[in-house]
Amino acid sequence: MTTNYIFVTGGVVSSLGKGIAAASLAAILEARGLNVSMMKLDPYINVDPGTMSPIQHGEVFVTEDGAETDLDLGHYERFIRTKMSRRNNFTTGRIYSDVLRKERRGDYLGATVQVIPHITNAIKERILEGGEGHDVVLVEIGGTVGDIESLPFLEAIRQLAVDVGREHTMFMHLTLVPYMAAAGEVKTKPTQHSVKELLSIGIQPDVLICRSDRAIPANERAKIALFCNVPEKAVISLKDVDSIYKIPGLLKSQGLDEFICKRFNLACPAADLSEWEQVIFEEANPAGEVTIGMVGKYVELPDAYKSVIEALKHGGLKNRVSVNIKLIDSQNVETKGTEILKDLDAILVPGGFGYRGIEGKIATARYARENNIPYLGICLGMQVALMEFARNVAGMEDANSTEFMPDCKYPVVALITEWRDEEGNVEMRSEDSDLGGTMRLGGQQCNLVDGTLARQLYGAPSIVERHRHRYEVNNMLLKPIEAAGLRVSGRSADHSLVEIIELPNHPWFVASQFHPEFTSTPRDGHPLFSGFVKAAAEYQKRQVK
């Protein structure tokens, strides 16, 4: 089977939505019965985004096999059924690291190592490796055409089109077509110049996705086609929409999938978008609204919690309610008190690292527990719930995590010192170990306890969820906490690690060490988020009474 590649680039400005557009196209092709995958190539020099600031880069999306990747891979998994892996995302830093390691080993036999051919060859090898076994692979190139950082990637895909054959490759370019209010018309010149930039490095786009705040008139599309040397039917108008889940239908209505299938000579049935139509209907017709407060450390950039925000919306879809998400800085809880948590139907505390704002999160968990407000804790959100309960219910006044207070009297959360790496080898780590790539990562089995809320929500005795953390519940101090009323409702397969906890005497209080948001999708939702939003709606009804 020959894999077909669609290379997706962006021009004029950044943040055009290449990832969403590419994922939407992938969803249509998948709906035609094709085996589709996606890749993201990031031009930054970091080896991966694992140690990058969430406020700068946004969230780190964790794949099933434990790769720390760009948040666009989250979009990919929410739009198509194919699960991403470490093969689906790589950076300039990763490529250079691999090439330099080979150079030190002598793999290049004394040759002068250069961007061309060594770096470009390494990029091509990874693209081909990631594309194995699929009918179509969409490869998104990060950054904007014209950026110096992107040049090796653009050169690599230019070469790959020759290597694989133009009959199996396609270049799709996203551009901005701005509307000038003073002139009362859209302007195509930025698109023309962006295509000219692509042509200067040897790439002729086959499809142009033209982003605008309105539909682009037919005469302007014809003008773009003429000056950019593409068929008029391959100039796609992609206007702003109120829901990203409308984009697959918008692209399909303009025949983009049909154009691609003919280009690749793929015989497949018409796309069935009924699942997406159902998602759009549920989103547009809520029976109510709930307000959920998310108390975090990186709230100035909502993309730092992208998957959590999307998972809450998915929970709303499954309960036919609109979810109003109120982002609250945990430091404000410390300075202003829990008054700012009033008028919420539920509270979620997501993951995070470092001491800043931690006492605000602990106060938030206490407020939810004492006021019977539905609470969902994720990763650090579970740890603060445990610390709060230990301090205020189990009588461990100094309870803390060794991440924040190494010498505390009751280290109820502590560093795991014995780990297994990707190959299964035992490795010892400490607080001084490298930060990058040294966490418990990826899908891990969790066995749920019968009779618990977690078991009821999942409807299965065993689950697999994704992790990203270094610290775990300290089993040595767990007995008095359980005796005080906290219940461990799920443990790792070897029973050594606490994965999920709950409070049986609370209407809905669940916290997990894993990240359930990474496996939530608009079509399927996720048991924890669906149950959490349902609990928020029930809490709201009780308050009205």
From Swiss-Prot:
CTP binds at S14, D147, I148, E149, K187, T188, K189, P190, T191, Q192, K223. Pfam families: CTP_synth_N (PF06418), GATase (PF00117). Gene3D superfamilies: 3.40.50.880, P-loop containing nucleotide triphosphate hydrolases. It is an enzyme of class 6 (ligase). GO terms for molecular function: ATP binding; CTP synthase activity; glutaminase activity; identical protein binding; metal ion binding. Pathway: Pyrimidine metabolism; CTP biosynthesis via de novo pathway; CTP from UDP: step 2/2. The keyword Repeat does not apply. Residues 1-266 are annotated as: Amidoligase domain. Keywords: ATP-binding, Glutamine amidotransferase, Ligase, Magnesium, Metal-binding, Nucleotide-binding, Pyrimidine biosynthesis. GO terms for cellular component: cytosol. Residues 291-542 form the Glutamine amidotransferase type-1 domain. The active site is at C379 (nucleophile), H515, E517. One of its GO terms (biological process) is 'de novo' CTP biosynthetic process. Allosterically activated by GTP, when glutamine is the substrate; GTP has no effect on the reaction when ammonia is the substrate. The allosteric effector GTP functions by stabilizing the protein conformation that binds the tetrahedral intermediate(s) formed during glutamine hydrolysis. Inhibited by the product CTP, via allosteric rather than competitive inhibition. InterPro entries: Class_I_gatase-like (IPR029062), CTP_synthase (IPR004468), CTP_synthase_N (IPR017456), GATASE (IPR017926), GATase1_CTP_Synthase (IPR033828), P-loop_NTPase (IPR027417). Mg(2+) binds at D72, E140. Catalyzes the ATP-dependent amination of UTP to CTP with either L-glutamine or ammonia as the source of nitrogen. Regulates intracellular CTP levels through interactions with the four ribonucleotide triphosphates. Homotetramer. This is CTP synthase. The gene is pyrG.
